[in-house]
Swiss-Prot record:
InterPro entries: aa-tRNA-synth_I_codon-bd_sub2, aa-tRNA-synth_I_CS, aa_tRNA-synth_I_cd-bd_sf, Lys-tRNA-ligase, Rossmann-like_a/b/a_fold. The gene is lysS. This is Lysine--tRNA ligase. A motif ('HIGH' region) lies at residues 43-51. Gene3D superfamilies: 1.10.10.350, 1.10.10.770, HUPs. Pfam families: tRNA-synt_1f (PF01921). Keywords: Aminoacyl-tRNA synthetase, ATP-binding, Cytoplasm, Ligase, Nucleotide-binding, Protein biosynthesis. The keyword Iron-sulfur does not apply. Its main location: cytoplasm. It is an enzyme of class 6 (ligase). One of its GO terms (molecular function) is tRNA binding.
Length: 548
C-alpha cells in the first residue's frame, strides 16, 4: 500500500482535536477548491444514528477547513443502483416510525430481489422508489443535525453519464483491472468484466457479460443467477445489450469511480472498509485509473446499549428519536470525540453524556475552577463547533434534575423549583428560562424510555384515592408538623420519614409506599425526601394531611 493511503496514519498527534489533524492531511495534498468531503451508504432497512458517522466526521473536518478560509463541498452518496439482495425485517416511514416488514407492502421488496433499489416501488407508497425513500430519510437526518450535505444518487450519476467515462476506461483496460482485482478477490478469471448490466427483460442486475464494445459503449450479457449470501437470486436467462448507463460497476471499482467523478479529497469510513475495499480501491485508483486516492480516515463503529446497531433487525435509534432526548449540541459533542476509539451510545446513561457536554460548556466560559489546562484548551477549540451561537447567558439545568422536574406537568412549578434550587438565576429573562426548560421534556422522555427512577408523575391536581390505618395517618400528620416547624433539606427530610415510621412501629417500606401513593398514585417512586424538599412547602404539608 502506498504510504499516503494508510487509513490509520492519522493518529492526531500534536493536535487537541482530531479534525484539525485530518484537515492538515487534506491540505498536504494541495486540493483544488472546492475541497470535496464524501461519505456514502447502500440502502438497507432503517437509517439510524450509526449511519451518521461519516456525515458528522465530515462535518467537523469541513468546519475546520472553512475556518481556514477554504470552500468545501460535503457530499453523501447513496449506492442506490445496488441490487436488493435480501429482505430487511424492519423499515422506517418518513416520520421515523419503525415498522415490521409485514406492516407495509412487503411484496414491493420480495418481488424485486436482484433489482436496483431505485427500480423497486416504495413499500410505503410515498416516494418514487425504495431507494428514494431511504435517501430522503438520510437527508432528513442530516438536516436535523444541521449538516449541509448534498445527497448524490448513484443511479442518477449513471443515468446522466457521470460514470460513463471511467466505466469506458476500465473496459478498455480490462486486463489491468483483472490483474489488480485478482490480488484481493477470488474467481477473477480471464472472462471477468468489471460491469454489471441491468437486464432489460426482468430488471435484475446480472454479472455475466459476454462481449464488450468499448468504442460503442455497449456490452452483451446473459441474465444469470446471482449469489446473495445464503440464497440465490435466479436470473431469467435473457440475452441482451446494455449501454454503459444501463448497469453499474462492481463495488471495488465503483468506489474509486466515485472518487474520480466527484473529485473526492477526503473520506472517512468504518474499519470494515479499511481492511477490505479500501486497499483494493486505492490500488485500482493509482494503478489502473492513474488517480490519487482521497485522504482517508478510519473510524471505529459505536454500539447502541452495548450491542451493534442492526438496521435490518431494528436494533437502532433514529436521529429524530435522539433529538427527542438530547439537545443538538450534545449529539454533536458525542461525534466530536476521538473517532479511533470504540464507544457505546448508552440510552440508560445519557445523563453522563449530557454532564460531559455541560462540563465542557462551563470550562469554555471559565466557570470550572478545577479545569485542567488540557480541558480548557480542548473546550476552547471544540465547543464553538458544537453550538450554532455562543451565548454566555444560556442556562443548562442538570439533566437528572430536569428529569425530576419532568415529574410534574406544571410549567410554572418546574420554573419555581428550578429557581429555588439555584438552577435558574434570579435575573434570567423569559426567553432564557424558556430555553432552559426545554431540557425538561427531553429528560422526561429519557425517563419514560428507560423506565428509570425518574419515570413518575406528580399527582398534583387532586389527592389520589387512599386508605391508611391509624398509625400511618398519625405518622403522616407528624411528618407534616415537622415540615411546618422546620426547614429541612432533602436528606434531613428523608431521615425524618424513617424516624416517623419507627416511632409509630410502621414497616419502613409500607410507610414510603404511603407517601408514594399520596404524591404519585404509585406504590414506589423516587427518593422521597429529596423530591418533596424541592416542592413548595404548603402543598407538601397539605397533601401529607390528606387535605388536598
Amino acid at each position: 500500500m502506498h504510504p499516503d493511503d494508510d487509513p490509520y496514519a492519522d493518529d492526531g498527534s500534536g493536535r487537541l482535536f482530531w479534525a484539525d489533524a485530518a484537515a492538515d492531511r487534506v491540505l498536504d495534498g494541495d486540493p483544488e477548491e472546492p475541497i470535496v468531503i464524501k461519505g456514502g451508504i447502500s440502502p438497507s432497512g432503517v437509517p439510524h444514528l450509526g449511519n451518521m458517522n461519516e456525515i458528522m466526521r465530515g462535518y467537523f473536518v469541513a468546519a475546520v477547513l472553512r475556518e481556514r478560509g477554504h470552500e468545501v463541498r460535503q457530499v453523501f452518496t447513496s449506492d442506490d443502483r445496488d441490487p436488493l439482495r435480501g429482505l430487511p425485517r424492519k423499515l422506517a416511514d418518513l416520520d421515523g416510525e419503525v415498522v415490521a416488514l409485514g406492516d407495509v407492502n412487503a411484496g414491493a421488496l420480495g418481488q424485486n430481489l436482484g433489482a436496483p433499489y431505485t427500480e423497486i416501488p416504495d413499500p410505503f407508497g410515498c416516494c418514487d422508489s425504495y431507494g428514494a425513500h431511504f435517501s430522503n430519510l438520510i437527508q432528513s437526518s442530516a438536516d436535523r443535525l444541521g449538516v449541509d450535505v448534498e445527497m448524490v444518487s448513484n443511479t442518477e450519476t449513471y443515468a446522466n453519464g457521470g460514470f460513463e467515462e471511467v466505466t469506458r476506461y476500465l473496459l478498455e483496460h480490462v486486463t489491468a483491472a483483472r490483474d489488480v482485482l485478482g490480488e484481493y478477490q477470488d474467481k477473477v478469471d480471464e472472462e471477468y468484466v468489471p460491469f454489471n448490466p441491468i437486464c432489460e427483460a426482468c430488471g435484475k442486475v446480472t454479472e455475466t457479460v459476454t462481449d464488450v464494445d468499448a468504442d460503442a459503449g455497449t456490452v452483451e450479457y446473459v441474465c444469470t443467477d446471482m449469489d446473495a449470501g445464503d440464497q440465490t437470486i435466479e436470473g431469467c436467462g435473457h440475452e441482451g445489450t446494455a449501454t454503459l448507463r444501463e448497469g453499474k460497476l462492481p463495488w471495488r471499482f465503483e468506489w474509486p469511480a466515485q472518487w474520480r467523478t466527484l473529485g473526492v479529497d477526503y473520506e472517512p469510513f468504518g474499519k470494515d472498509h479499511a481492511e477490505g475495499s479500501w486497499p483494493s480501491g486505492t490500488d485500482i485508483s493509482r494503478n489502473v485509473l492513474g488517480d490519487e486516492p482521497p485522504t482517508p480516515m478510519v473510524y471505529e463503529w459505536f454500539t447502541l446499549d452495548g450491542e451493534p446497531f442492526s438496521s435490518s433487525a431494528g436494533h437502532v435509534i433514529l436521529v429524530q428519536d435522539v433529538l427527542a432526548l438530547l439537545e443538538l449540541p450534545v449529539v454533536r459533542y458525542f461525534f466530536s470525540k476521538d473517532p479511533r476509539r470504540a464507544r457505546d451510545f448508552s440510552i440508560e446513561h445519557l445523563d453522563q453524556l449530557v454532564d460531559e457536554f455541560d462540563r465542557m460548556e462551563r470550562v469554555y466560559f471559565g466557570e470550572a475552577a478545577d479545569a485542567s489546562e488540557d480541558e480548557r484548551e480542548r473546550a476552547a477549540r471544540v465547543y464553538p463547533l458544537l453550538v450554532d451561537d455562543i451565548d454566555a447567558d444560556r442556562v443548562r439545568i442538570p439533566f437528572t434534575f430536569a428529569a425530576v422536574l419532568g415529574m410534574t406537568e406544571d410549567s410554572a412549578l418546574r420554573e419555581e423549583i428550578a429557581r429555588r434550587e439555584g438552577h435558574i438565576p434570579a435575573d434570567a429573562d423569559a426567553d432564557t428560562v424558556a430555553d432552559a426548560l426545554t431540557r425538561v421534556e427531553r429528560a422526561r422522555e429519557w425517563a419514560r424510555r428507560t423506565n428509570n427512577e425518574f419515570n413518575y408523575r406528580l399527582a398534583r391536581a387532586e389527592i389520589p384515592a387512599h386508605d391508611f390505618d391509624d398509625a400511618t395517618a398519625a405518622a403522616l400528620d407528624e411528618l407534616a408538623a415537622f415540615l411546618d416547624d422546620e426547614d429541612p433539606d432533602g436528606e434531613a427530610l428523608q431521615g425524618e420519614i424513617y424516624e416517623a415510621a419507627k416511632r409509630h412501629d410502621i414497616d419502613i417500606g409500607a410507610f414510603f409506599a404511603a407517601g408514594y401513593r399520596l404524591f404519585f398514585d404509585e406504590d414506589q417512586g423516587p427518593k422521597l425526601g429529596p423530591f418533596l424538599a424541592k416542592l413548595d412547602r404548603e402543598f407538601v404539608v397539605t397533601r401529607l394531611r390528606r387535605e388536598g
